[in-house]
């Protein structure tokens, strides 16, 4: 059980599954462990995989349970790290590259070259990541399955990410009435279009909203009579709504991870 739990973290580290899928699998396993019969907090060596009843002869190995404690401590620390690390990293690109290489029907030099280029870059922006996922769709069933996982967590945790692909040109213009608004917009994008973690959004939500609000104020003050005002205003309002959804989803996920880590600690503490 302990090795399986750590293999889930390893799969996430290698980019073969996403953060959401990793926590789901860990939660399912811990939930099953809590249902298993124990002896003074220790697990028996054998259980029926269907009924979960301990198999005879009943046997408790202090060595195996001791190893399990070590695995669970590592697991808990790894789960904390999942929340702090960027949701999109080079390991995700490496995982996609491996899956593409193993499942492509023919040598896919174009996509492999794109993946290698992103691997060599210093960071991967949210926009680059979304364009990559769109570009790789349809290559194979396995690739599409992994892309679906990544898109699911992107839509849950960063629902504003797709808005970054359709920013009104006027919000990025450095000329005329949009000059100050563009400067505020750049400050907002620096906080969103980079290697950001769930912890980053959770901790800096109010600061991000402040940057968004300043952009709105600048737009309303300086460009309310311009031709692109309505489109730009709608985009900013959509971003505000999406950020609220992002914060809510991340907060719920943080609570879920906290409960899981508490359950893991309880399992450890019960082993005398």
Please report, for each region that a protein language model flagged, where it lies by residue.
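Acidic, mature catalytic/reactive cores of soluble proteins
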Residues: 1-272
């Amino acid at each position: 059980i302990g090795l399986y739990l750590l293999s889930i973290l390893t799969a996430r580290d290698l980019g073969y599954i996403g953060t959401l899928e990793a926590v789901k699998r860990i939660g399912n396993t811990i939930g099953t462990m809590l249902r298993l019969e124990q002896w003074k907090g220790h697990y028996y060596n054998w259980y029926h995989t269907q009924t979960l009843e301990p198999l005879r002869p009943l046997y408790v190995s202090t060595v195996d349970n001791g190893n399990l404690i070590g695995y669970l401590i590592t697991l808990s620390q790894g789960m904390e790290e999942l929340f702090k690390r960027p949701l999109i990293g080079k390991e995700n690109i490496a995982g996609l590259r491996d899956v593409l290489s193993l499942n492509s029907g023919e040598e896919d030099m174009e996509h492999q070259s794109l993946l290698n280029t992103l691997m060599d870059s210093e960071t991967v922006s949210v926009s680059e990541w979304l364009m990559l996922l769109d570009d790789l769709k349809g290559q194979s069933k396995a690739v599409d399955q992994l892309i679906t996982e990544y898109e699911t967590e992107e839509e849950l945790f960063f629902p504003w990410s797709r808005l970054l692909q359709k920013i009104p040109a006027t919000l990025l213009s450095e000329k005329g009435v949009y000059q100050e608004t563009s400067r505020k917009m750049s400050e907002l994008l620096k906080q969103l279009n980079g290697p950001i973690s769930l912890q980053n959004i959770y901790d800096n939500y109010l600061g991000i909203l402040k940057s968004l609000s300043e952009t709105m104020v600048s737009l309303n003050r300086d460009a309310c009579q311009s031709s692109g005002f309505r489109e730009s205003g709608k985009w900013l309002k959509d971003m505000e709504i999406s950020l609220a959804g992002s914060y809510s989803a991340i907060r719920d996920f943080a609570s879920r991870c906290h409960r899981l880590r508490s359950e893991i600690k309880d399992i450890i503490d019960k082993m005398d």
